C-alpha cells in the first residue's frame, strides 16, 4: 500500500484535492475519554515530542523540557499523546516547570491506535515531532503543527510549510542542525 502514491500521484498537482479527515475516531470513546479526563470545554493541545524509531530518534526528537516550554504561560490543557514509557519524564517536567501534562491511564498510546485517535479527536490542536501521532492526526483531519529536524524525511518535501499528504498540517523546520530553538 505504501507504494501506491508512486502509481497514482506522480506530480504535486495530483495532491490538489487531497481529502482531509478520512479516518474517524469512535465518537462514544471520545465522549467517554472527555469525561474520564474531566476536560469539559477547555482548550486542549495534544503533544508528542519524540520518535522511538531507533535510526532517526535523535534527529527527530527533543526532550519534553525543550518542547514543553513552548506552552509556558498559555491557558490550555496539555494532553500527552506520546507513546512509550514517559511517566517519569512527565513527572520530572511537571515538577521542574509547574506545567501539568494530562495523561490518560486507560489508553496505551503505542498499542491502542483507536484510543490514540480518540485522544487526538479531543484536541483543539496537536503539536508534535514527526512520528506516528502526526500521521494519525493528519488522517483524522486534526489541525497539527509538526516540528521537523533540519534534514527531514522525504515525504515532507523541501521549503514547504504545508503537507501535500495532510492539508491540516503546518510544518515548522529547524533552521540549524539539531537546534530546536530556531523553530
Set out the residue ranges of the language-model regions:
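Catalytic machinery of carbohydrate-active enzymes
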Residues: 1-183
Amino acid at each position: 500500500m505504501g507504494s501506491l502514491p508512486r502509481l497514482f500521484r506522480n506530480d504535486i498537482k495530483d495532491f490538489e484535492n487531497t481529502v482531509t479527515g478520512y479516518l474517524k475516531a469512535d465518537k462514544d470513546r471520545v465522549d467517554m475519554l472527555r469525561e474520564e479526563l474531566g476536560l469539559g470545554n477547555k482548550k486542549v493541545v495534544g503533544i508528542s515530542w519524540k520518535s522511538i524509531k531507533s535510526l532517526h530518534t535523535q534527529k527527530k526528537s527533543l526532550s519534553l523540557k525543550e518542547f514543553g516550554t513552548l506552552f509556558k504561560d498559555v491557558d490550555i490543557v496539555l494532553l500527552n499523546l506520546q507513546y512509550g514509557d514517559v511517566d517519569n519524564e512527565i513527572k520530572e517536567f511537571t515538577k521542574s516547570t509547574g506545567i501539568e501534562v494530562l495523561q490518560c491511564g486507560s489508553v496505551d498510546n503505542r498499542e491502542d491506535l483507536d484510543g490514540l485517535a480518540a485522544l487526538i479527536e479531543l484536541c483543539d490542536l496537536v503539536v508534535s515531532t514527526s512520528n506516528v501521532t502526526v500521521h494519525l492526526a493528519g488522517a483524522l483531519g486534526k489541525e497539527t503543527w509538526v516540528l521537523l529536524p533540519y534534514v527531514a524525511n522525504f515525504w515532507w518535501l523541501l521549503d514547504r510549510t504545508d503537507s501535500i499528504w495532510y492539508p491540516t498540517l503546518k510544518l515548522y523546520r529547524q533552521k540549524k542542525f539539531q537546534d530546536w530553538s530556531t523553530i
